[in-house]
Amino acid sequence: MLVVAEKEIAGLMTPEAAFEAIEAVFASMARRKAYNFPVVREAIGHEDALYGFKGGFDASALVLGLKAGGYWPNNQKHNLINHQSTVFLFDPDTGRVSAAVGGNLLTALRTAAASAVSIKYLAPKGAKVLGMIGAGHQSAFQMRAAANVHRFEKVIGWNPHPEMLSRLADTAAELGLPFEAVELDRLGAEADVIVSITSSFSPLLMNEHVKGPTHIAAMGTDTKGKQELDPALVARARIFTDEVAQSVSIGECQHAIAAGLIREDQVGELGAVVAGDDPGRGDAEVTIFDGTGVGLQDLAVAQAVVELAKHKGVAQEVEI
């Protein structure tokens, strides 16, 4: 078994490589060459933590495995980030474990890559202003990935804890973009593309906030009860997701479904847009990508890292 330590990931995986891997996975899913296993995601009743498993099998790339981990909101006292995970890959021919890969940075990179894929295919023409909702650990990755696929002129942002907005300001400066902190109503009115990446359990961006052609990448809702968007806003939009079954059960669409505002068959697959089987935005004023995060995304970036680690000689071989 090969082990690729968390400390090695930053020197191996780039945002560009993550984007390429995730875009390919979306297309494989649309062509039914790859599928995700049912998600296990539970509150464990200790440290307010959420823990679970996401896995899948990509028959076209012969990649099999799972990611184990979750969200520990009190990790700051341990000087650790809140998201903790490890990816395990298995030989699809024998079932033997083939690799264990640190999953923390990979999770941030693949989540950002997924929203960037949605921006590439669904952003309104002439989009100039990027709106960021949330300033946690993953927000910087999200902003960089968005800027990699679209030329924005300005970034505006909001966070429930304003003292954290310096992360967004610093990242925007790194990208050579001006940044302004704004309230949510102004963010919804001015941003052409909005990325939300929070752990909220109540709606933040309301229907009346959003004006004009807009694409929203809703990346924070991946558990029952979590919510970032007003269900009326979801109902107003043309909706795409990574996995429909997850979107309607643990994603942003769970609330609009429960309220009877949308049907499951109104939720499209982003992979179909990537594969050229769905026109995507069309004449919709608002599009939403409900990014629930799927195991296949984790496996794709982990497999890419393993190959890079072998090439650079930084993968450790162990017997178990």
From Swiss-Prot:
Induction data: Induced by glycolate.
Q: Name one GO cellular component term.
A: cytoplasm
Q: Name one GO molecular function term.
A: NADH binding
The GO biological-process annotations, alphabetized, read as: glycolate catabolic process; glyoxylate catabolic process
Q: Does the keyword Translocase apply?
A: no
Q: Which Pfam families match?
A: OCD_Mu_crystall
Q: Which InterPro entries match?
A: ImmsucRedBhcD, NAD(P)-bd_dom_sf, ODC_Mu_crystall, ODC_N
Q: What class of enzyme is it?
A: oxidoreductase
Q: What if the gene is knocked out?
A: Abolishes growth on glycolate or glyoxylate, but the deletion mutant strain is still able to grow on acetate, succinate or glucose with comparable growth rates as for the wild type.
- Annotated residues that bind NAD(+) are located at R110, H137, Q138, N159, S199, M219, G220, T221, D222, K226, G291
Q: Which Enzyme Commission numbers does its entry carry? A: 1.4.1.-
The protein's annotated catalytic reaction(s) are: L-aspartate + NAD(+) = iminosuccinate + NADH + H(+)
Q: Which UniProt keywords apply?
A: NAD, Nucleotide-binding, Oxidoreductase
Keyword Oxidoreductase: yes or no? yes
Residue positions of the active site: K67
Top-level taxon: Bacteria
Q: What does this protein do?
A: Imine reductase that catalyzes the NADH-dependent reduction of iminosuccinate to L-aspartate. Is essential for the growth of P.denitrificans in the presence of glycolate and glyoxylate since it functions in glyoxylate assimilation via the beta-hydroxyaspartate cycle (BHAC). Thereby BhcD regenerates the amino group donor for the first step of the BHAC.
- Comment field (misc): Iminosuccinate is a labile compound that spontaneously decays into free ammonia and oxaloacetate in solution.
Q: Which family does it belong to?
A: Belongs to the ornithine cyclodeaminase/mu-crystallin family. BhcD subfamily.
Protein known as: Iminosuccinate reductase
The root-end lineage is: Bacteria, Pseudomonadati, Pseudomonadota, Alphaproteobacteria, Rhodobacterales
